[in-house]
Amino acid sequence: MATCWQALWAYRSYLIVFFVPILLLPLPILVPSKEAYCAYAIILMALFWCTEALPLAVTALFPLILFPMMGIVDASEVAVEYLKDSNLLFFGGLLVAIAVEHWNLHKRIALRVLLIVGVRPAPLILGFMLVTAFLSMWISNTATSAMMVPIAHAVLDQLHSSQASSNVEEGSNNPTFELQEPSPQKEVTKLDNGQALPVTSASSEGRAHLSQKHLHLTQCMSLCVCYSASIGGIATLTGTAPNLVLQGQINSLFPQNGNVVNFASWFSFAFPTMVILLLLAWLWLQILFLGFNFRKNFGIGEKMQEQQQAAYCVIQTEHRLLGPMTFAEKAISILFVILVLLWFTREPGFFLGWGNLAFPNAKGESMVSDGTVAIFIGIIMFIIPSKFPGLTQDPENPGKLKAPLGLLDWKTVNQKMPWNIVLLLGGGYALAKGSERSGLSEWLGNKLTPLQSVPAPAIAIILSLLVATFTECTSNVATTTIFLPILASMAQAICLHPLYVMLPCTLATSLAFMLPVATPPNAIVFSFGDLKVLDMARAGFLLNIIGVLIIALAINSWGIPLFSLHSFPSWAQSNTTAQCLPSLANTTTPSP
């Protein structure tokens, strides 16, 4: 019997792929309408995404097959959804992130900030959280966590044992600082000699030798890295993929929205939200793992102990080993600043941006998008050399001159670019298009009209809690892709501004704090062996609730004037919402 269950479990992906489409067939057979056909496709993809029976990107390709065969959308129209402006913004932003990571600029920033904050417990944890959150705003959450966790463990090792300070004085390189990304599945720690040691054994031995105090500090440090990576991605439009899913869905479902979600408007709304949530997460982790002893945690009136001096020396040594800033790092820093400035000033809304002045269309709107800017800076990085131009000798062929490589080369980009996310974003946009064309969105909206009697803040909080729970066991991109079209239809049906529910639910997909499988940063810190699932769940449960409340605060305060959430927008009007005049919008929405 046990063997039978083991076989079923081993072949579960094949069984799901084979039986789920068959079990769902009664829906399109008994209800032969386009709405039912589209619902069949969406439910099938949602189940495949939740179970990961197929790779997420492969499931995202289903609309290319199902929608044309079901007569919902032409193949040529579906294909266009896979390379929209939001996808190009994601691609261009990642080009810059790959350049930052390739030339180790992110490590220099991290070490420099840690030298400033010092190594006393509370400032050290805050320093790690600030650095991780800032880097996560621009580069992938996974890459940020993979770099910061080894640094955190190296500092903790020095805090625990002052004997390691002798290695620092000799100028030896600390192998723990080497950038590594442990596999959550295999759960191993890679050493410099190429061997792999199981984390489980290291964990059991470590728990036997570590003092309870040091174990708590280690757990706190590990969680602060993965949590701040997820929180930091909230702040910018390119910080995490769900943010771009929202922008793409808004532009697809409501083409006349006037570019309401752009880099500047998103940052104005999400950055304060991120800062408040980050500070509250810092306080919560301190209370949970270190106790709320302000004087002790901040080391007020105490001299730096030998272990703390050793840990500080580790950071100093690693920062010194990076050497002075190279030409490539300086060039990338300048291009990065230019990119952010161009994003903010393109079409800010409260004054005419350079996009409106230099490249206006017939309506005076900017013809240049945030994606255009990102691609432009990305292309520049392929052109600018990584070393100051000069007569450089080829080390492999003495006597011959060799031009330096660019800041980016295609081989590096091809290796580090998460192409699967590009397809996943496209699959989400294709689903939204199919839902609109089939009439499923309109049908769902009509069924949800009774919600009009429920206060809008209550709707936003309940939906945010639902999404935050759902994303603990499902990809945040898949979660956003599934929920946003439904939420848009619901908002239209009850005469509520679509962004009033779509914004908080998008942010809620980043509140994946409870389980190691919820997000790659969680899996990375868990693989180092210092945490149990219960430790993460205990810390993440309250943080999830705090996050939902902070998002509710944001959407009902500074979010209202930023996006005019107090009234139903004209661009969200449809045939079924003709009665939703601005004056008749959901009156339970708070006024500014």
UniProtKB/Swiss-Prot annotation:
Ranges annotated as biased composition (Polar residues): 165-177
Activity: how regulated: Li(+) decreases succinate transport in the presence of Na(+), by competing at one of the three cation binding sites.
Superkingdom assignment: Eukaryota
Ranges annotated as spanning the membrane: 13-33, 53-73, 86-106, 114-134, 221-241, 274-294, 324-344, 371-391, 450-470, 482-502, 511-531, 545-565
Leader peptide range in chain numbering: none
Transmembrane keyword on record: yes
Any one of the GO CC terms: membrane
Region called Disordered, residue ranges: 165-185
Localization per record: Apical cell membrane
Topology of the protein relative to the lipid bilayer: Multi-pass membrane protein
Tissue-by-tissue expression: Expressed in kidney and intestine. In kidney expressed in the proximal tubule (at protein level).
PROSITE patterns reported for this sequence: NA_SULFATE
Pfam short name (any one): Na_sulph_symp
Catalysed transformations (reactions): succinate(out) + 3 Na(+)(out) = succinate(in) + 3 Na(+)(in); fumarate(out) + 3 Na(+)(out) = fumarate(in) + 3 Na(+)(in); 2-oxoglutarate(out) + 3 Na(+)(out) = 2-oxoglutarate(in) + 3 Na(+)(in)
GO terms classed as biological process: alpha-ketoglutarate transport; cellular response to lithium ion; fumarate transport; succinate transmembrane transport
Biological role: Low-affinity sodium-dicarboxylate cotransporter, that mediates the entry of citric acid cycle intermediates, such as succinate, citrate, fumarate and alpha-ketoglutarate (2-oxoglutarate) into the small intestine and renal proximal tubule. Transports the dicarboxylate into the cell with a probable stoichiometry of 3 Na(+) for 1 divalent dicarboxylate, rendering the process electrogenic. Citrate is transported in protonated form as a divalent anion, rather than the trivalent form which is normally found in blood. Has a critical role in renal dicarboxylate transport.
Family, similarity comment: Belongs to the SLC13A/DASS transporter (TC 2.A.47) family. NADC subfamily.
Protein name: Solute carrier family 13 member 2
Phylogenetic placement of the source organism: Eukaryota, Metazoa, Chordata, Craniata, Vertebrata
Gene name of this polypeptide: SLC13A2
